[in-house]
Structures are given as structure tokens and as C-alpha cells.
Amino acid sequence: MERVLIIGGGVSGLATAYFLSRYAIPSTIVEKSWRTGGLIKTDLTDGCQLEAGPDSYIATKPAVTELTQELPGLRDQIIGSNDAARRIFVVRDGKLQAMPQGMVMMVPGDWDALKKSSVVSAQAKRAIHRETKWKPLERKEDISVGQLVEEHFDAEVLEYLTEPLLCGVYGGESERLSAESVLPRFMGYERKYGSLVKGVRQELHDKPRAGSLFLSLRDGMQTLTNSLAAAGAGRANVVRGEVIAVKQDGRQWQVRVGKEMLTAGSVVLCCPAHVNAQLLAASVPSVANELAAIPYSSAILVMMVYDQAALGHSTDGFGFLVPRGERKTIAAATWVNTKFPSRIRPGLAALRAFIVSHRAVELAEATEAEIVALVQDDYKRLMGITAQPLFHTFHRWPNSMPQYVVGHAQRVTSLFQQLTEYPGLFLAGNAYDGVGIPDCVRRARDIAQHICEKSV
């Protein structure tokens, strides 16, 4: 059976190799880094598991959980977040305010909790109540998340309830992000009920929440990519090197890695869209142009570990979110010792700062020491922390977060339609139809199945 070339050894590439191996289809992974796993990386320091990339995945998307049931050693690894302490705070006027319990994005699932909350004003609460009068609406074109929320509620709900949550996932601005691609569930509510509040109420009635919202792995998220590497990529040939170009040669695809030329019947590109665009620029310019049009945001992660007794502030909750208007360095902070207590040694507190969007761009040339100092200043102002951390870890992820801007779904549809003209060329990763790890695994599974069906 013809070998498949997989470009990129992150979770998408490793998952593709694994699913291909289930069909006995040989593959070769080309990875320029010294390690596989991509953005998934677990640092083990002084008895603590510190995630350099994603720390969990959403429980409502089953692809990763299903995968753990078949990978050796992972069946008993799944752990849930400590949802008994699932309190999230939002910074308003320089102070941490508890977000109302039961929120589903910007929509309240618990009216009493909303009434008691000081995150939004009485005027915003009235706007949320008025929204229940909306009638079903079928839009003819995509709109931004900002437009959707302001039309249904108001600017305050957008600033303090919506944007901070989205920023932690997409690292982008609401006025640019696509409502259809980022909030498809809510667009569905608008079409069916008109009111987003009515849609959430009905969903909570039909499918009450059960279990943890976030899932992870007991020994760290890197356990997933390590297991994939051993189970699937372990049967694949791994080539270390940087891909220069990809081009079609009759029914074959040629991949130049340094001075070497590799040939295969199928190529799966698992790199960021802008990297894929460079690889295809000379040979498939129409596809390359669509890929190059997908913008990206950068991220910086700073993990600080403190002596809990010296912290001087409670970490009873999952952490806090910082709206843009508060003008802080960090966009979000996770209190890891509460969200996943087993990851942090007893007596310690771990604060995970997330810097994204324009702030990450502004700090692109800043040193690690300068950024750490800015994060500490935010903690001092918001939490009153004056103690020095026992240690910290620091990671930059430049151009790592694809932005699903207005019109993204149409662009992806056009992109995939063009791919049908190039048999054997596939795109995997988080730039197309889902940014989470489960989305990457699902897409890898579907590509492997398609290659198998075409090879029969």
C-alpha cells in the first residue's frame, strides 16, 4: 500500500499517523523540531505538572475521550476539572468580580445568580431580559461576534461577559471574529428561537449538565501526544527536517525536505495555514492564496508557582478574565492548583497567565524578564500579591492561534472545494473547522478514513 506523507508532528499529524496505522496504511511524518507534539507540552518541575500549551479539552466533544479508550495506557488517565470550585472572576474597574454561576458564554442559565452579580450593571441585566422577546431570524450573511452580542444584548454584555471568554480560546477581537464559525450553536438558537436566552434555557432543560466541563490527563496533556507517537507514529517513519515545498507530479506528490525529495500518493499538511500557504505557493497558488488569507494571533504563557501561605490571596476558583478595556498585560489567568489540584504539589499555588492578541504582538520583542515583571505587576494590582514566585516557566507561541474572522466558513468551503481538484492533498489542524484538540483529532480521523476508502 502506498505510503502517506504527513507534514507536521503536532497532535494532528500524530493522530493522522495513528488512524492510518489502524488501516495498515504506512506513513512518514516530517517534523522540523527536535520533538513531536507541537503546542502540547507538559513541563515537570519540582513535583508540579505545568502545561505549556492547552491544559485540557472540552468534554462535550468526544473525539479525544474516544481516542483514549483505544490507546494503550490512557483508558484510566482521564481526569475532570474540579468543578465543585468552578468559579470564574472577571476584572471590572480593577477588581475581581465573580461571574454569575450557570453562564453559557454570555447567556445566563441562572437568573437569580445574574441578579446578584456585580459584573454587569442593572441596565445590562434589563437588556438580557428584553432579549427573550426576539423572534426567529435567518441571516443571509455572516456577522461578527461583536455585532451578534450587541444586537441581542448591549456593549456591556459584550465587553464583560463575551469577549473575555472568547479571548482565552481564540485570542482575537469580537469585532473581527465570525459569529457563524465561533458561535455556531448560538446562531442556531437565533434561527430556531430568535432569542439566545430561550435557546440556552431549552438546551439546559433538554440536556442538563453532567460531569466536568473540562477533561485532561492525569499525567499531563503531553501523555496524549506521547501515546499517539508510540502507538501510531511508532509504526511510522519520522523524518527530521524542514519542508521547503510541496508539488504535484502526475498522480504523485513530491515533498522537498532540505536537499532530499520524498514522493507519496497522498500528503497531509498539518502545519499552520500560513506555513501551508508557503509550501504550496509555487505549485497550487489558488489554494495557497486562500490559506494565506487566514489570519493568526500569537500567545505567551507564563506559569508562576508560589508558596500558598505567602500568596496573600485566595485561589478558590478557576481563575479570572481581563476585558480589553481594563488595560492589563494578561488576558486571563488560571489558578491551576484549584482547577486541577493533582497537578500541583500540596502547599503550592500555580498561576498560569495567558497573554494574547495585540498585547502579545506588542511584547514580541520584550525579554522574558520584562514580561514576567509585567505579569507580576498585574497580579499585584489585581490580587495584592507581593511575594516572589518560587519558580516560573515561560513559553512564546508566535502565530499559533488561527482567527476565524467574518467569512471564515465561506473561505473554508471554497478552500475544500478547490482541494477536490488535487487528489491526494489534505489539510489537517485547527485552522479550518474547530480550534480545539478534539477538533484536530476528529479531522485527522476523517482524513485517514477517506484515504483508506480511496485506496481500496
Predicted regions and their residues:
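Short, well-ordered coil/turn residues at beta-beta hairpins
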Residues: 60, 151-152, 270-271
